[in-house]
Swiss-Prot record:
Required for maturation of urease via the functional incorporation of the urease nickel metallocenter. Its main location: cytoplasm. GO terms for molecular function: nickel cation binding. It comes from Yersinia enterocolitica. This is Urease accessory protein UreD. The keyword Iron does not apply. HAMAP family: UreD (MF_01384). Keywords: Chaperone, Cytoplasm, Nickel insertion. UreD, UreF and UreG form a complex that acts as a GTP-hydrolysis-dependent molecular chaperone, activating the urease apoprotein by helping to assemble the nickel containing metallocenter of UreC. The UreE protein probably delivers the nickel. Belongs to the UreD family.
Amino acid sequence: MSEPEYRGNSFTGSRHALGINAPELAQYQDEPAQMRRRGVGKSGYLKLRFAKREHRSILAEMERRVPSMVQKALYWDEEMPELPCVTMISTSGCILQGDRLATDVIVEAGACAHVTTQSATKVHMMNANYASQIQNFTVEEGGYLEFMPDPLIPHRNSRFITDTTINIHPTATAIYSEVLMSGRKYHHADERFGFDVYSSRVAAHVFLGKEQPAGKELFVEKYVLEPKSESLDAIGVMQSFDAFGNVILLTPKEHHERILARVPAHFDIKGGIASGATRLPNDCGLVFKALGIDSAGVKNEIRQFWKIAREEILGVTLPEKFLWR
């Protein structure tokens, strides 16, 4: 059975074809024996639209399809009381073979939003097919978005492909974070970098307006990890580290220099952490990367960068970190 293609700036269907023509997944096109790919409960979809209303922003529209869901927006950020904070939840508790997931997040003009996850995302062991995820973010004029999920943990023999597109107005700001773990390294000797494929693509375009095609391409970053074909422990890749953090900050050029001045390169092999920031093409923003021996160290580095970005762009800082995070 053929699968419909993803088209346009948002994903509103229940199925997508991401991964079918990906060379890195060519040998993983077989149908799962347990439940067919993109079946009931395996085609998750989540749409979140945030809008400005008087003194604060609100979650104005929400659409969900299992296993993806959210609950109501909360306002727990005391430094930004106008900021709606939404937690994405999976009713399945993990990502399984044959899963096809998609997310649309829209921040309308002048609105703000913070989106996170309830916990780390696990990509379970697979014996057929793969899992895929499409993410689309649109941030309109003067909008502000923070997308700060917890780490993703690929289990042994798993295959996962993700494609992220950010459409952003030149006056808007978006901070997009992702943290990838080496696997469940304390669970089994073969779990550390035991996954088959992890493929990630992130691209950004200028937002031209609603119902308009995507504007100028600002940058594209893609990497494909196949640790069973090529070791990730090499110098210049992961070396001895087990956690990788990647943060994309898209914001007007006027903020870049001040942020970079406060984010020096950091390399401490004994302390198990390395991080640094640089500019993205087309003066569209900055990219910050961190390596660590565990998720805690990488998350701390990301939080510090996030804090600096907020202070320089909005003039407000982060609230105290929750004890359970």
